[in-house]
Amino acid sequence: MNAIYPGTFDPLTLGHEEIINRAAKLFDNLLVAVAVSSSKLTMFDLQDRLKLVEIISNRYPNVTFTSYKGLTVDCAHTNNIKTILRGARNSTDFNYE
């Protein structure tokens, strides 16, 4: 089974890294998808965020990464992925999703 882990990753945190670590063990393939968000003012530009994600992704043979614009579901569909992975720090995050 394949999964997509989308986010702006601005910045990539230890929490994100832990989710990638766990997901790499659960799924055959994991796509870490770095969102280009025109509505968010980011601390790091897209290229810097991709570099950080690449460093983590390279630790796992079944983890790849990409950037995308638009809807997460469209990115998942384009990559033939049916499972979207999300992290939730607390009930507020869970309710938001």
Question: Language-model segments: which ranges?
Answer:
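Nucleotidyltransferase catalytic core that binds NTPs
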Residues: M1-E97
